[in-house]
C-alpha cells in the first residue's frame, strides 16, 4: 500500500461542495415562432436558445430547427378532420425576437393511418416527385381505400389489379397537374382543405369507388437558394412586429392603478 497524503481529506471536505449551482435557463432567451401567412394562427409557440456569447450566435442556433404543429392549432379550429394532419415548419430567419418559419412537410398521425386500414378492402398507394414553379422539389404520397357497394351482398370490396393500376395512374397524374402549376404557397393552400385528395376521389369513381382518400405525406427534397425577400413576402410584413395580425388573445379587465407584483427570481 502506498503511503502518502490524501489531498481530498486534507482540504477538509468533498470535491464540488463550494461550486456554485447556476441555473442554465438564466443563459437562455425565448423566441416567438411565426408561421407563414397561409395559416390563421401566426404565433404557434416559443423556443429557447442560448444567448449570443463569443463566437456562438443565437440566431445561428435557431436556424434549421423544425417544429411540428397540428393543422387544427394552425387554423384555430377544433374540426376533427384537421386534428390528425401535422405540418412541419422550419426556421429560416430570425427577426428581433421572432423566428420566421417556412413549410417543411406534412404528415398524418399514426393513429389515423392505423384506424383506416381494415379487412375486406383494397389499399391503394402512390407517390410522385414533382417540382413547383418556384423551384421546390416535393415528394407527394397519396393513399386511398376501395369502398363497399351498399346495394351489394358481398362482404368484400376488392379491386382488380388492372383497376388498382388505373387508380394509381390517375393519382399520379392529378397530383402532378395540381402541383406543377403553383408555387409552394399555392401547394400549402391546397393541402389545408385537402382539395387534391377530393379531386382524386371524384376522378376515380368511374374506375372503382374510393373512400378515405388523403395526401398521406409531403416531403421537401430540394429547395431553391434562400432569399430573405421571398420569406418576408411569405410572412406578409415580415413578422418582426409584436402586434402582428393573426396573433389571438383576450383582454383582461384590471382595476385602475394596477401594477404587477415584483418577482423575486427571473
UniProtKB/Swiss-Prot annotation:
| SMART domains, A to Z | Ribosomal_S3Ae
Family named by the database record: Belongs to the eukaryotic ribosomal protein eS1 family.
Ordered alphabetically, the record's keywords are: Cytoplasm, Ribonucleoprotein, Ribosomal protein
- Molecular function in Gene Ontology: structural constituent of ribosome
- State the name under which the record lists this protein: Small ribosomal subunit protein eS1
Record's keyword annotation contains Cytoplasm:
yes
Q: Where in the cell is it found?
A: Cytoplasm
In residue numbers, the region (Disordered) covers: 237-266
Subunit structure, as described in the record: Component of the small ribosomal subunit. Mature ribosomes consist of a small (40S) and a large (60S) subunit. The 40S subunit contains about 33 different proteins and 1 molecule of RNA (18S). The 60S subunit contains about 49 different proteins and 3 molecules of RNA (28S, 5.8S and 5S).
Mind listing the GO biological process terms from this record?
A: translation
Give the top-rank taxon of the lineage listed in the UniProt record for this protein. Answer: Eukaryota
Which is one Gene Ontology cellular component term of this protein? cytosolic small ribosomal subunit
Looking at the keywords, is Ribonucleoprotein present? yes
Output the PROSITE patterns linked to this UniProt entry: RIBOSOMAL_S3AE
